[in-house]
Amino acid sequence: MGYVVPNAYRNRVARNIAGETPRPDIVPAYAKLGSGRYNSSTGELTDPAPTDTDVQSPIPGYTNLPVTVSVVGNSVQVRLQVPGGATPVDVTEIGVFTSDGTAVVLDSFRPVTLQAPLTLQTTYTIYPEV
């Protein structure tokens, strides 16, 4: 499992560090779960390092999930905790976004089945490039 921070967000952070954009523009605000970027026939990731701007196949009901953001030194930690529902859902991708929809993190991985009483928890640590 590996994730990418898209260039659009990296550029926004660089502009923020330079004092050109306000802090709220770079704060992660919500997450989406998806079921794309994985071929169940071959068991392979179809896009293990996504470079576009959204999850490939959003899962209905899992598209506006709250995240917890904390600053640790010069990094930002984004935590996501999603309780499973009554129906099992195979999750193969996660996207974290700012309030205006700019992708902060795009991640793809082999399927994780989410169903109550299980909870999906993940943490991403982002370091600014200066």
Residue ranges and their predicted role:
Residues 1-91, 99-130:
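Small cysteine-rich, disulfide-bonded extracellular modules of the LU/uPAR three-finger superfamily
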